[in-house]
């Protein structure tokens, strides 16, 4: 958050209390799609410590049983807010448990599609809805109506699929409206937020720009200066442009060329940010320093840590060279944190097990005694992209595929050398170039080439060769939690493979990775 004033105090907000469901973040996403601001907090949130009043409250699903000894329960103060409440799956069972304990194990678990039968279509929650497919994911069920409630919807296995309090705007549903499998789920969520909570649909990036610029100016004040690392990716570019709009040249961006960036990346980023966007940028070539520390290292986790630690060292050293004018002082560090990062840190089930170390600049705060400023921390990725376009950032940059913090170092499997990096980045450049020529770039979520630590026999002209292997990867995904490989035409892969083998010295063979996530991860390392 950029300044002391919370976004939830500036826009009508729906509070989503998370009981640990894998779908909880989708509730927030769906409401944002209707231009309604929604904020997710753990189910243990004390209402007295909230600091703002929501227009409505949604209780998410969760993997627990409400009757278990260690089951999480909501602060009963939500009922004193006198705002509409919607319980989803576990959230409905929580409402029932509080009002009569009519919850227990079901005769059979219910996972997958079911048919919702609306029996009271006069109720505003189901306005515009009829019998439809909904997504179930529960083992417990209501064994009777909680005190003061009536039934408004059923399914074949759930006689209490939808319930409502007879005198208060408190609703419960057994299914998950937030997932796409519930065909009219979006309608239900909109009915709740707009018709029942009367939340204004004014959460737009157009409104956010002015609000956030004012917050930044209040926080930074008229004299303090800000530094931040940029990578050429959408998050750091949007954050940097927003900061520049707010405080001008008092923001200092630093691009560290670590020797494992994409082909011509440093030069291209400098041209875009300085000439195109007017960002005050320093480019530091530390490629030899990074590559020397990576010499002989093959373990991917060690690569990530070496690059992360070296980055902090280089960034600190270069930041000390910045001398603000008129006795001004650098007091803040800009970071492009997004809302999914915030959700992961505050989710009731806590941060998930670390599969790979993520590259960030968290260590800089303690070392440099700076305060953190995160202007994008309330935004999802799609909102950041929209914001970037409104700020005049080129379309190609705004919709660029993700690139890992450790860069090509984790796309060169095995030891990272200057020569190996060059092979990988040239192959990657050809691959992305052909994807764009074919008009496929925006259909693919992420694509890249990586260099394998094996050699293969080949024939070039009349000569036998024994060179390296490139693996191509392209995936489709909506959330990067799961992903499927992209089904290229064979003719496209043939063209890319031919170009790479003929134009990149040291490559004898090209393969295409057709592994989904899971079991594989998106990156090879």
UniProtKB/Swiss-Prot annotation:
Signal peptide: none
Domain Glutamine amidotransferase type-1 residues, every copy: 13-202
GO cellular component terms given for this protein: cytosol
Annotated EC: 6.3.5.2
Cellular localization per UniProt: Cytoplasm, Cytosol
Enzyme active site: 89 (nucleophile), 176, 178
Keywords assigned by UniProt, alphabetized: ATP-binding, Cytoplasm, Glutamine amidotransferase, GMP biosynthesis, Isopeptide bond, Ligase, Magnesium, Nucleotide-binding, Purine biosynthesis, Ubl conjugation
Cofactor(s), by name: Mg(2+)
Positions with a binding annotation for ATP: 231-237
Pfam families, per the entry: GATase (PF00117), GMP_synt_C (PF00958), NAD_synthase (PF02540)
Subcellular location, principal: cytoplasm
Self-association and partners: Homodimer.
PANTHER family, sorted: GMP SYNTHASE [GLUTAMINE-HYDROLYZING], GMP SYNTHASE-RELATED
Function according to Swiss-Prot or TrEMBL: Catalyzes the conversion of xanthine monophosphate (XMP) to GMP in the presence of glutamine and ATP through an adenyl-XMP intermediate.
The protein's name in its UniProt record: GMP synthase [glutamine-hydrolyzing]
Lineage: Eukaryota, Fungi, Dikarya, Ascomycota, Saccharomycotina
């Amino acid at each position: 958050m950029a300044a002391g004033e919370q976004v939830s105090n500036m826009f009508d907000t729906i509070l989503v209390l998370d009981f640990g469901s894998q779908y909880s973040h989708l509730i927030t996403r769906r409401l944002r799609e209707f231009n309604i601001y929604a904020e997710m907090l753990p189910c243990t949130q004390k209402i007295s410590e909230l600091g703002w009043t929501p227009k409505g409250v949604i209780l998410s699903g969760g993997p627990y049983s409400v009757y278990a000894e260690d089951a999480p329960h909501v602060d009963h103060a939500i009922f004193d807010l006198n705002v509409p409440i919607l319980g989803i799956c576990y959230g409905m069972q929580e409402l029932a448990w509080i009002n009569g304990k009519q919850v227990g194990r079901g005769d059979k678990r219910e996972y997958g599609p079911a048919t919702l039968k609306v029996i009271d279509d006069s109720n505003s929650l189901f306005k515009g809805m009829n019998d439809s497919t909904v997504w179930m994911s529960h083992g417990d069920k209501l064994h009777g109506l909680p005190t003061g409630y009536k039934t408004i919807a059923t399914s074949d296995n759930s006689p209490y699929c939808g319930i409502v309090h007879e005198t208060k705007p408190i609703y419960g549903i057994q299914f998950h409206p937030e997932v796409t499998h519930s065909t009219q789920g979006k309608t239900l969520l909109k009915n709740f937020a707009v018709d029942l909570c009367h939340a204004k649909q004014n959460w737009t990036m157009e409104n956010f720009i002015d609000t956030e610029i004012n917050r930044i100016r209040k926080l930074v004040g008229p004299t303090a200066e800000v530094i931040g690392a940029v990578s050429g990716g959408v998050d750091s570019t949007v954050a940097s442009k927003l900061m520049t709009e707010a405080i001008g040249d008092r923001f200092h961006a630093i691009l560290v060329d670590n020797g494992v960036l994409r082909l011509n990346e440093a030069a291209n980023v400098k041209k875009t940010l300085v000439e195109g966007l007017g960002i005050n940028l320093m480019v530091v070539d530390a490629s030899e320093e990074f590559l020397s520390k990576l010499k002989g290292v093959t373990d991917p986790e060690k690569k990530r840590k070496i690059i992360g630690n070296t980055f902090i060292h280089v960034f600190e050293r270069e930041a000390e060279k910045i001398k603000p004018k008129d006795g001004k002082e650098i007091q803040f560090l800009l970071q492009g944190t997004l809302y999914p990062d915030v959700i992961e840190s505050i989710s009731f089930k806590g941060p998930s097990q670390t599969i790979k170390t993520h590259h960030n600049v968290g260590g800089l705060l303690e070392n440099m005694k700076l305060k953190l400023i995160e202007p994008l921390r309330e935004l999802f990725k799609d909102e950041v992209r929209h914001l970037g376009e409104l700020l005049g950032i080129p379309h190609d940059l705004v919709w660029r595929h993700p690139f890992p913090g450790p860069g090509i170092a984790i796309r060169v499997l095995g030891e990272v050398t200057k020569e190996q990096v060059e092979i990988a980045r040239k192959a990657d450049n050809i691959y992305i170039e052909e994807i764009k020529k074919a008009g496929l770039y925006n259909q693919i979520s992420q694509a890249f080439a990586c260099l394998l630590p094996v050699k293969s026999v080949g024939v070039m002209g009349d000569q036998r060769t024994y060179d390296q292997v490139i693996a191509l990867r392209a995936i489709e995904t909506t959330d990067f939690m799961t992903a499927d490989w992209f089904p290229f035409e064979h003719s496209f892969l043939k063209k890319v493979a031919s170009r790479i083998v003929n134009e990149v010295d040291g490559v004898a063979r090209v393969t295409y990775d057709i592994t989904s996530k899971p079991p594989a991860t998106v990156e090879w390392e």
